[in-house]
Amino acid sequence: MKYIVLLGDGMSDEPMQELGGKTPLQAARTPHMDAMARRGRIGLARTVPEGYPPGSDVANLSVFGYDPRACYTGRSPLEAASMGVELGSADVAFRVNLVNLAPTRGTLVMNDYSAGHISTAEGRELIEAIQGVMGTDEFQFYPGVGYRHLMVWRNGKCGMTVVPPHDISGQSILEHLPKGEGAERLIELMNSSQLVLNNHPQYRRRLEEGKVPANSIWLWGHGKAPRMASFHEKFGLTGAVISAVDLVRGIGVCAGLDVIKVEGATGYIDTNYEGKVTAALEALEAHDYVYLHVEAPDEAGHGGNLEHKLKAIEDFDARVVGPIMAGMEKFGSYRILCTPDHPTPLRLKTHTDAPVPFVLFSGETSENAGVAGYDEESARSAGLVVEDGFRLMEMMLDR
């Protein structure tokens, strides 16, 4: 038996007036996901436990089959694992976003949480400049992918409250600055970064090219190294993870899965879908399980871009789900779990903890009478609700 998870990050949403009361999943053309829903088991899963932030970290841990209440320590330690950055027991990792802040009516607002979806090469250039000026034995900066980078505070503080920048798009940053023990050190670093970035040659170059420049860092998502059982210990399977996002790769590292990096995987609508599909099917020749993650719908949700979200969903269906369904046939016995991790509603431009629609499919499953297709309402109407999202993995394995 071969198993594959197809994860459309942030794919679920709310009914929208612009779509005649439909959600993007209902409005998008998704014949392959619809076919799975009509022949498989469809329902809703609550991937974010009550009281936990509805982040991709918590939600993806659930879909991997891990109870976040038992192993979640924060987002950035997972990203550090993906990047090969070792954390001592007293070290605290932070996500570093390259952002654009804009003066508006006497305050600074979060204009763009991704600095115009800055490229990986440009992001590396800036983080290396920041490390050169601001890096010390205590604070160290590591380049990642696109706008997503890492800082480690050696023997650092961990009790402060921080806010994800994508949660405050268009809002003043003043009421959202870090608070609590150690917060003043983080604010100092963010302020110092503005001097480095505003004086970097890249700032003027991006302005001249009509692009949004990075003019600050934003620190968030902190935590210490987690303790997790390996995927093989937990489920008795070998596996691999395919994603452009360090967070998801990091969960794979902590779970002892192979992390497969695909050239051209960007975490955006221009990602290399075909390369991911090829890598997934090749990995299943050697492994029992693959987790194939696509970030594009989530990025469209954060940007509030309906056109991009519809395109991301349709590309996910046509360029990932369809080819995977066809490619799995050669294995004979297989199961596919297709799901978002959490909703990222266009109206809110951030995540919610609402249950997500999932479909569990195998080539042997029979017709589902009355199921219209794969979307939030069809999943709700089916009446199946998995209250503990981490049990989706047990359902997939029939345990």
UniProtKB/Swiss-Prot annotation:
Give the Enzyme Commission number: 5.4.2.12
Gene this protein is translated from: apgM
Q: What sort of enzyme, by top EC class, is this?
A: isomerase
CDD domains to which the protein is assigned, alphabetical: iPGM_like
**Source organism superkingdom:** Bacteria
- Keywords assigned by UniProt, alphabetized: Glycolysis, Isomerase
What Pfam family is a match, any one?
PhosphMutase
Q: Name one GO biological process term.
A: glycolytic process
Question: Which catalytic reaction applies to this protein?
Answer: (2R)-2-phosphoglycerate = (2R)-3-phosphoglycerate
Q: What is this protein called?
A: Probable 2,3-bisphosphoglycerate-independent phosphoglycerate mutase
Pathway listed for it is: Carbohydrate degradation; glycolysis; pyruvate from D-glyceraldehyde 3-phosphate: step 3/5
Q: What does this protein do?
A: Catalyzes the interconversion of 2-phosphoglycerate and 3-phosphoglycerate.
What InterPro entries does the record point to? Alkaline_phosphatase_core_sf, ApgAM_prokaryotes, Metalloenzyme, Pglycerate_mutase_ApgM
Example GO molecular function: metal ion binding
Annotated family: Belongs to the BPG-independent phosphoglycerate mutase family. A-PGAM subfamily.
